């Protein structure tokens, strides 16, 4: 009996987190089918898990970035620029996929519900204005409100200032960073319980009956996201690492995408991505910045959502649009979505702005937002899974490509001579 108990405890504490999450997923579905009141009640577990992730993520980002920059040695290489380039390339590629698929399989909407209680941004200037204001936010306010642009700005500034600090100060910062990382690991071990609660309560509260009216729209949306995750992203990664990208792609989808799918927040998934980068032995100076930055600005999924829903509204209203205009829409949508990917459902608030490019009235555009919330059970989950798993995928691809260059000086010299 004791031996059996010991094996069970070992599985809980040290077992595969992915297997435990799958068990929690199945158990949540079963409970929702068996008892709706019980399933809604265990939703508390999901709320606590997501709340814990959101609580620890800002502190984790602040401490990791400060520690990373403060201890940065002169001449030590980081690879932020190549990762940012991949983020941009991935977002525009996703937008292009959404445009092409929307023209091949045009969707229409049933515009009945309005969402008058939501105030979307009035234009791209307002979006960029808000983004710039986020950079100069009060550090305490940024931590309390999970403003990752502001947190990164302060962390970078403090990190640079602390480069000249005494070694004992730097050691203290490292110890604080390690302590926060340990807390994060403990929180992540509760992921199976959190997923169990989220799945059970979501299915019990909403079901999937409302989604039947929008089957084609969902097929186009999720089809675009799968195409980006399984075709476009692997092509980008292959271009970077020059070997089979799928082991890395599937690892990122399995360990980052699954959790992000249920938390529906790129910000809440930052600790999961950080832990995965650490397991892969990536450069901490790089991933401590690229992961939180990606949670805010890497918006491939948001670009797909905005483009597909806006073009669905265009097709519904019978507006004729040419391919260059549709592509311009996707570019504008991708730029505007910057800063919205860290908020559950944030990309939907940019739809009225995108619709305004085609002269669609705001009241009609808000009905499109209403449709977005109806399908949000799947749309927002799939979007977040794509966004968050892409953060760690592109970070790993760039870090591994840099490691390969360092391991092969001849190839590096040949690259310089070209």
UniProtKB/Swiss-Prot annotation:
The UniProt record lists the keyword Transport: yes
Domain of life: Bacteria
InterPro entries, per the entry: Na-dicarboxylate_symporter, Na:dicarbo_symporter_sf, Ser_Thr_transp_SstT
Topology term for the membrane: Multi-pass membrane protein
GO biological process, one term: serine transport
Catalytic activity field: L-serine(in) + Na(+)(in) = L-serine(out) + Na(+)(out); L-threonine(in) + Na(+)(in) = L-threonine(out) + Na(+)(out)
Main location: membrane
Family according to the record: Belongs to the dicarboxylate/amino acid:cation symporter (DAACS) (TC 2.A.23) family.
HAMAP family xrefs: Ser_Thr_transp_SstT
Record's protein name: Serine/threonine transporter SstT
Lineage: Bacteria, Pseudomonadati, Pseudomonadota, Gammaproteobacteria, Enterobacterales
Gene name of the encoded protein: sstT
């Amino acid at each position: 009996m004791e031996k059996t108990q010991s094996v069970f405890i070992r599985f809980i504490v040290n077992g595969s987190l992915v297997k435990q999450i799958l068990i929690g997923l199945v158990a949540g579905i079963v409970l929702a089918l068996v008892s709706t009141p019980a399933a809604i009640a265990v939703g508390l577990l999901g709320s606590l898990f997501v709340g814990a992730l959101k609580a620890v993520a800002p502190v984790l980002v602040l401490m990791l970035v400060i520690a990373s920059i403060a201890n940065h040695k002169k001449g030590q290489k980081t690879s932020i620029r190549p990762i940012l380039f991949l983020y941009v390339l991935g977002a525009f590629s996703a937008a292009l996929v959404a445009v092409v698929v929307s023209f091949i399989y045009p969707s229409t909407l049933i515009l009945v519900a309005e969402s008058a209680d939501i105030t979307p941004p009035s234009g791209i200037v307002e979006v960029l204005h808000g983004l710039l204001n986020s950079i100069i936010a009060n550090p305490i306010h940024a931590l309390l409100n999970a403003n990752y642009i502001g947190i990164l700005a302060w962390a970078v500034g403090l990190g640079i200032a602390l480069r000249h600090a005494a070694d004992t100060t730097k050691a203290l910062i490292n110890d604080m960073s390690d302590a926060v990382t340990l807390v994060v690991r403990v929180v992540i071990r509760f992921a199976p319980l959190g997923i169990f609660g989220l799945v059970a309560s979501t299915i019990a509260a909403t079901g999937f009956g409302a989604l039947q009216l929008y089957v084609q729209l969902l097929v186009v949306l999720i089809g675009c996201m799968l195409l980006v995750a399984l075709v476009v992203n692997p092509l980008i990664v292959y271009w970077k690492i020059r070997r089979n990208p799928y082991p890395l792609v599937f690892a990122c989808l399995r360990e980052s995408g699954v959790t992000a799918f249920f938390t529906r927040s790129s910000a809440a998934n930052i600790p999961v991505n950080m832990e995965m980068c650490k397991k892969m032995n990536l450069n901490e100076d790089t991933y401590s910045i690229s992961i939180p930055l990606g949670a805010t600005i890497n918006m491939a999924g948001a670009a797909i959502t905005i483009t597909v829903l806006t073009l669905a509204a265009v097709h519904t209203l019978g507006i004729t649009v040419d391919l260059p205009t549709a592509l311009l829409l996707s570019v504008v949508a991708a730029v505007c979505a910057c800063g919205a990917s860290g908020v559950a459902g944030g990309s939907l608030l940019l739809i009225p702005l995108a619709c305004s490019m085609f002269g669609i009235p705001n009241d009609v555009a808000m009905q499109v937002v209403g449709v977005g919330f109806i399908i949000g059970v799947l749309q927002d989950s799939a979007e977040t899974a794509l966004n968050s798993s892409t953060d760690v995928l592109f970070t790993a691809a760039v870090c591994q490509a840099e490691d390969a260059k360092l391991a092969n000086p001849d190839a590096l010299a040949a690259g310089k001579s070209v």
